[in-house]
Amino acid sequence: MWRLVAVALLALPLGSSIALAEDMKLPPLRKQPTQQAVIDEHMDALNKCDWNRLMAQYPADYQLNLPDGVVVKGREAAAKIFADFVKPHDQGGLCGIKFSPEQTLVVGDTLNIQWNAEADFLAEPYKGSDAYETHDGLMVAMVSTFKGSDLKMKK
């Protein structure tokens, strides 16, 4: 996001995401067999703008820490954030961004990733880092440098 995501989402209007998330039923949790599988599923779901697959990874106590002291707590709050992210770009979302890992470091149950994000609507690639905390086959926390207002869009 990867999970870079949420701050970009902060640059998007949240009103429509709240309505969208309320209309969308949270999918059942789907545990992955390994720490790497959790991250691979997250990245693939994010890159494919698959809200259901994203939400199947986050338990009720999920926490996302973003720049500027923004903290998203809980599965329902994350659902609202990601609902905007997966919308097509022409509808105010960021669907179309592809996150590619450039460097990975595992420390215990935390996977630290430096990534590159590119999209047809971006004027230049965007780089960032995320730390993913996994437990029992789920993503329980993420710390991300992703900040949507820093994306340079094509005019």
Q: What positions do the PLM features span?
A:
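Short, low-complexity N-terminal intrinsically disordered segments enriched in polar/charged residues
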Residues: 19-56, 60, 153
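Surface-exposed, charged secondary-structure patches
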Residues: 79-123
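Hydrophobic pocket/interface hotspot
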Residues: 42, 54-55, 62, 74, ...
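A short gly/proline-enriched turn/hairpin at secondary-structure junctions
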Residues: 62-73, 88-92
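Hydrophobic/anchoring residues in structured secondary elements
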Residues: 51, 64, 99-106, 144
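Short beta-strand segments enriched in hydrophobic/aromatic residues
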Residues: 58, 115-119, 145-146
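Short beta-strand edge/turn micro-motifs at domain boundaries
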Residues: 2, 125-155
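Bacterial N-terminal signal peptides
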Residues: 6-16
